[in-house]
A protein has these predicted regions:
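Alpha/beta-hydrolase fold nucleophile elbow
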Residues: 101-111
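N-terminal cap/lid segment of alpha/beta-hydrolase-fold proteins
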Residues: 3-31
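Short beta-strand element of the alpha/beta-hydrolase
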Residues: 34-42
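The alpha/beta-hydrolase serine catalytic core
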Residues: 22, 127-186
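Alpha/beta-hydrolase active-site loop
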Residues: 83-100
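Conserved alpha/beta-hydrolase
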Residues: 56-78
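Short glycine-enriched nucleophile-adjacent loop
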Residues: 114-125, 131
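The serine-hydrolase catalytic nucleophile loop
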Residues: 43-56
Length: 186
């Protein structure tokens, strides 16, 4: 972390990282020794979840540098969730690595975050010293969501570009045709 980033702590409001298009990502950074541990959250998850904060406590106790962040449209980051794609979230992750953790890193990803961490590691192999993947969901747009897309959902995706997927955790959330098509690319 640079001296400027060392000033950011995990207490209080998150810091922000500007992204193209004027949106910002939200993050908390804990200064410490390297390699920096970087948390990659899951689909519709945010950096305030129990896994992200438990790893932060562990990092603090060890004096380990740590970054947790919210992707575009997640948590405290700007942007409309329905406009997010794997490509966009991968770009967010690479920006976090470039701007907030430019040295050696260990990526920790949960669910979709495991997929994004793998995609980031393929682009930055010299930087990534390790991967810890918790229930990674590579290709979840095809493997996990595909079987759930019934005739009514397909019709909604064809007609409006959006399917409101039921959720066990709250209100249904938008799955867009662009997310599914973009997921096929990776």
């Amino acid at each position: 972390m640079t001296d400027d980033q060392d000033q950011h702590t995990t207490s209080g409001q998150p810091s922000t990282l500007a992204r193209p298009g004027g949106q910002t990502l939200a993050y908390h950074a804990t200064p410490g020794k390297g390699p920096t541990v970087v948390w990659f959250g899951g689909f519709k998850s945010d950096m305030t979840g129990s896994k992200a904060t438990a790893i932060e406590e562990w990092a603090r106790a060890r004096g380990q540098a740590y970054v947790r962040f919210d992707y575009f449209g997640h948590g405290e980051a700007e942007g409309e969730f329905a406009k997010g794609t794997i490509t966009r979230w991968r770009a967010d992750a690479l920006a976090v690595l470039d701007e907030l953790a430019p040295g050696p890193v260990i990526l920790v990803g949960s669910s979709m975050g495991g997929w994004i961490a793998c995609l980031a590691a393929m682009v930055r192999p010299e930087q990534v010293q390790g991967l810890v993947l918790v229930a990674p969901a590579p290709d979840f747009t095809e493997k996990l969501m595909g079987p759930e897309i019934d005739a009514a959902a397909r019709r909604a995706l064809e007609e409006t570009g959006v399917w409101m997927r039921p959720s066990d955790y709250g209100e249904p959330y938008p799955i867009t045709r662009s997310l599914l098509e973009d997921g096929d690319r990776w």
